[in-house]
């Protein structure tokens, strides 16, 4: 098992953790329906960037 040779200082520990921050997922608002959805994903009603791209079960 690996064992550290020297104690990591609080400064180095903080630098090591600098990339561990959580990010907020990008939320977009559909222009035609006003619904929110994840960026680069279609909305629950089947719209993407103002166009109908998928038929929903209620329409089929």
Swiss-Prot record:
InterPro entries: Ribosomal_bL32 (IPR002677), Ribosomal_bL32_bact (IPR044957), Ribosomal_zn-bd (IPR011332). Transmembrane segments: none annotated. Disulfide bonds: none annotated. Residues 1-60 are annotated as: Disordered. Residues 9-19, 49-60 have a biased composition (Basic residues). One of its GO terms (cellular component) is large ribosomal subunit. It comes from the Bacteria. Keywords: Ribonucleoprotein, Ribosomal protein. One of its GO terms (molecular function) is structural constituent of ribosome. The keyword Repeat does not apply. GO terms for biological process: translation. NCBIfam families: rpmF_bact. Belongs to the bacterial ribosomal protein bL32 family. PANTHER family: 50S RIBOSOMAL PROTEIN L32, LARGE RIBOSOMAL SUBUNIT PROTEIN BL32. This is Large ribosomal subunit protein bL32. It comes from Polaromonas sp. (strain JS666 / ATCC BAA-500).
């Amino acid at each position: 098992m690996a064992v550290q040779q020297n104690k990591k200082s609080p400064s180095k520990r903080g630098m090591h953790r600098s990339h561990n921050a959580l990010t907020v997922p990008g939320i977009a608002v559909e222009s035609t329906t006003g619904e929110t959805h994840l960026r680069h994903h279609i909305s629950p009603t089947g719209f993407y960037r103002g166009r109908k791209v998928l038929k929903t079960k209620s329409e089929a």
